[in-house]
């Protein structure tokens, strides 16, 4: 079944997961798109991106919305017409949306060896010490998703994943951790939830504490 999961992350935040098994035509016939969305869809070269785009619109329908309720600001951040926050992610055969009363950022990542090889570029690799190769890959992918999720909330030019976004050390079984963003002489704090969906990592960041001077 394409709609894989609906899960409450907290009292006012819901995750919707779609596993893409349909053809492009099946997905296209199942949604109504506004003109700007149709133009965006037609501009996508890869069918996988087109199917991801359409599956997100199916998830919107599951959440009680349609494509006409969704718009993007000048920075590419999605917004809903009713004022609720939304974050969107698509990776290969899966799409997710998270809808919340809170400011959130969500990311979905396929587990792949390349992420572990690149880990020194975006994280404190001492957090991988003593782990098996499998656990190291999972943890590095979670950390990448954490930093993507935080960036989706802030979306400010100049933020470096390695130099500005710092995750507390965590165990994979915890499925949560804390993150600090140190940028422009400010500190901001985030609460992170993560989970594993087949061969993917799902991460959601919540903006937990207001900005304060360092």
Could you describe each region identified by the protein language model?
Residues 1-214:
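Core catalytic alpha/beta fold that binds nucleotide/phospho-ligands
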């Amino acid at each position: 079944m394409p709609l894989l999961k609906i899960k409450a992350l907290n009292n006012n935040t819901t995750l919707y997961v779609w596993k893409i098994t349909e053809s492009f035509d099946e997905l296209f016939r199942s949604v109504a798109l506004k003109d700007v969305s149709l133009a965006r869809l037609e501009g996508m070269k890869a069918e996988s991106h087109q199917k991801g785009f359409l599956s997100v619109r199916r998830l919107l329908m599951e959440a009680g919305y349609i494509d006409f309720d969704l718009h993007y600001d000048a920075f590419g951040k999605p917004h809903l017409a009713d004022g609720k926050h939304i974050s969107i992610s698509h990776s290969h055969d899966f799409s997710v949306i998270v809808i919340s009363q809170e400011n959130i950022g969500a990311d979905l990542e396929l587990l792949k060896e390349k992420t572990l090889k690149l880990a020194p570029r975006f994280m404190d690799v001492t957090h991988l010490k003593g782990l098996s190769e499998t656990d190291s890959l999972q943890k590095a992918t979670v950390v990448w998703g954490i930093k993507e999720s935080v960036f989706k909330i802030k979306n400010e030019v100049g933020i470096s994943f390695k130099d500005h976004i710092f995750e507390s050390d965590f165990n994979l079984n915890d499925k949560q951790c804390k993150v600090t963003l140190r940028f422009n002489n400010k500190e901001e704090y985030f609460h992170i939830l993560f989970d594993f969906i087949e061969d993917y990592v799902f991460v959601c960041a919540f903006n937990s504490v207001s900005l304060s001077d360092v």
